[in-house]
């Protein structure tokens, strides 16, 4: 499959989701959508999926994130992408608060990403094309 920058951004988002799952190999995508219009630098993404939980049951859920629009380096034949900085900082704060057992009054990463996604018009991507390209190497960049 030939991928465009938006699709590579979605592949990266699915890779990030897999990193958060207890059983990443159980991930099944139900749908993948981006929100248009998005800024040239950020892509809000919504992923509906199922995965196995730690007791063997299947959970259906939605994951929202905001990633940078992937860029392609022709000289090195590599794609680059990363989590959008506001999304990433909110996610890190959630992790720290979780470790400390405290709550934050700041809007969480999922709420932030869902709000960004809902600001635009959803456009579905081919979920099969996204999941079949999970082996794609994407250089992670800080935004």
Can you annotate each of these PLM segments?
Residues 1-143:
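Cystatin/cathelin-like cysteine-protease inhibitor module
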